[in-house]
């Protein structure tokens, strides 16, 4: 028996056919991408390869066309779209912000360790230390959020008794004996709580939302309409609207008025204002998925029946339908909450939430790219502990970071601008920005000059071919990387730099494992 090694191509990757203009025997035609598709892929590229956030526009164009070889996209249109969507602003100081439209209530608060002070109209309020704190010391604890919001993607498991009705914790280790002994299940539906603590905190709200007919509370909530509202939020991943519904329902049940009082102390902004600064809407969006800014799509066909073709739905349409269902669930809601106030409640949740929950003290803490404090989550993401990252003096403002501290200055500021409406002016940002100004990038000047003389052609009549850039400026983040141990304490996602190598022509490339369309096969020749 003789074995022969033969090399063939994967059956779904005939590269020669693509380059020759045909694929599987049929004509291969390039498609013109939409502005949304271009923006989404640029932001996704920045997420996947943080080093490209500071690349020249020519290098960025080369990477995008390399990733999407089926696109018909000219360099002039690419630059025009990025400028219009503020994805390649040379001066971020000139872009739109919504910080001036955020309303800061005058309400203040304090305890033995910290106090809330009003800073000014631009910065609103901040949390200040009332005593000295050493590095690593716990500044404060928040045992629970204003209202606990279960993860939207776990509602199916919750409705089938596979996850806790309050916190969403999986119930695989909860025995039937324990459920019966501690009465952890609902008498009417399949809902189960993971502990007596969760049931005590959530049972009354669950009764109102899903079984209001039992307690004669139909006048304030219609259980059937509540399910329709929740289903709609699930369909469009509208976490903020779902959260607002739970918070409003808790306000109706709270005889002490504490929930409403804490909610009214939060900084507020309409979601309509926030959505104007969205730079992309797909998987690569700078906007957080939690912030209710995912692409709204529905499946339909020409005859109206559901089919596997997706159609984008306007944000306004989703908001209006969601508000209609919200008022259907809460019959008296329209008397005090109109459509614009509903959007303000959504925006308020988004700018104050921390990992999907709204906490009283945490909502007052401002941002800094080199914070003096960090947050630790314990007990299934319910309790928060605020630790001192460095020594804090009495009267000093306590700050945390809102964004990934390992990102470059441009990406950090872009995320802050889009998600919270301001540009960070901290010392670290200023130092990194000054580094860009001090170190001129000749490649960028040349690329910008070449693209600047192009006539802007939105119809993509210009040639797409262009020379590859020969290098890429390193992210300024590498000049001021925080200590890794400190980053881990922040409990936030971060990315590690990938080593770079230089080839014989001086081109900078990422070290990686390469895969192609070839496959080796051992053939038995008899």
UniProtKB/Swiss-Prot annotation:
According to the entry, every stretch annotated as the SET domain falls at: 112-403
Q: Please list the residues that carry the modification Phosphoserine.
A: 517
Its Gene Ontology cellular component terms are: chromosome; cytoplasm; nucleus
What is the enzyme's main class?
transferase
Entry's EC annotation? 2.1.1.-
UniProt keyword terms in alphabetical order: Chromosome, Cytoplasm, Methyltransferase, Nucleus, Phosphoprotein, S-adenosyl-L-methionine, Transferase
> GO BP, one example?
methylation
Instruction: Name the PANTHER family on file.
Output: HISTONE-LYSINE N-TRIMETHYLTRANSFERASE SMYD5, SET AND MYND DOMAIN-CONTAINING PROTEIN 5
Identify this protein by name. Answer: Histone-lysine N-methyltransferase SET5
Q: Which organism is it from?
A: Saccharomyces cerevisiae (strain YJM789)
């Amino acid at each position: 028996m003789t074995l022969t090694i033969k090399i063939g191509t994967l059956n779904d990757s005939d590269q020669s056919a693509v380059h020759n203009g045909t694929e599987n025997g049929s004509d291969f035609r390039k498609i013109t991408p939409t502005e949304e598709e271009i923006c989404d892929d640029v932001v996704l590229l920045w997420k996947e390869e943080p080093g490209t956030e500071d690349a020249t526009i020519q290098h960025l164009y080369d990477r995008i066309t390399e990733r999407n070889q089926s696109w018909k996209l000219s360099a002039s249109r690419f630059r025009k779209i990025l400028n219009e969507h503020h994805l390649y602003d040379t001066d971020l100081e000139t872009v739109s912000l919504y910080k001036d439209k955020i309303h800061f209530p005058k309400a203040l608060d304090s305890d033995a360790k910290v106090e809330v002070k009003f800073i000014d109209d631009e910065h609103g309020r901040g949390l200040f230390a009332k005593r000295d704190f050493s590095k690593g010391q716990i500044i404060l604890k928040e045992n629970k959020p204003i209202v606990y919001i279960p993860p939207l993607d776990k509602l199916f498991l919750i409705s089938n008794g596979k996850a806790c009705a309050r916190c969403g914790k999986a119930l695989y280790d909860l025995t039937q004996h324990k459920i019966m002994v501690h009465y952890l299940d609902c008498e009417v539906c399949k809902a189960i709580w993971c502990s007596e603590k969760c049931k005590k905190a959530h049972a009354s709200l669950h009764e109102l939302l899903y079984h209001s007919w039992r307690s004669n509370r139909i006048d304030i909530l219609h259980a059937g309409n509540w399910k329709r509202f929740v289903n709609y939020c699930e369909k469009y991943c509208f976490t903020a609207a779902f959260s607002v519904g739970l918070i409003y329902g808790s306000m109706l049940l709270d005889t002490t008025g504490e929930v409403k009082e804490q909610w009214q102390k939060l900084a507020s902004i309409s979601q309509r204002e926030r959505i104007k600064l969205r730079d992309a809407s797909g998987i690569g969006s700078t906007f957080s998925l939690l912030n209710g800014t995912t692409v709204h799509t529905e499946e339909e066909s020409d005859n109206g029946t559901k089919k596997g073709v997706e159609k984008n739905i306007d944000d306004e349409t989703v908001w209006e339908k969601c508000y209609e269902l919200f008022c259907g669930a809460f019959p008296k809601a329209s008397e005090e909450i109109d459509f614009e106030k509903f959007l303000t409640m959504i925006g308020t949740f988004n700018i104050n939430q921390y990992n999907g929950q709204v906490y009283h003290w945490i909502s007052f803490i401002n941002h800094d790219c080199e914070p003096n404090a960090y947050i630790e989550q314990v007990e299934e993401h319910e309790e928060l502990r605020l630790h001192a990252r460095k020594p804090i003096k009495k009267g000093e403002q306590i700050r945390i970071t809102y964004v990934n501290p390992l990102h470059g200055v441009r990406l950090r500021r872009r995320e802050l601008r889009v998600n919270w409406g301001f540009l960070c002016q901290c010392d670290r940002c200023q130092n990194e920005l000054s580094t860009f100004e001090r170190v001129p990038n000749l490649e960028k000047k040349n690329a910008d000059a070449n693209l600047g003389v192009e006539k802007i052609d939105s119809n993509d009549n210009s040639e797409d071919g262009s020379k590859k850039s020969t290098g890429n400026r390193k992210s300024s983040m590498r000049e001021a990387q925080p200590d890794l141990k400190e980053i881990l304490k922040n409990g936030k996602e971060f990315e590690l730099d990938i080593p770079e190598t230089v080839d014989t022509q001086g081109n900078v490339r990422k070290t990686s494992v390469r895969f192609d369309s070839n496959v080796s096969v051992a053939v038995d020749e008899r």
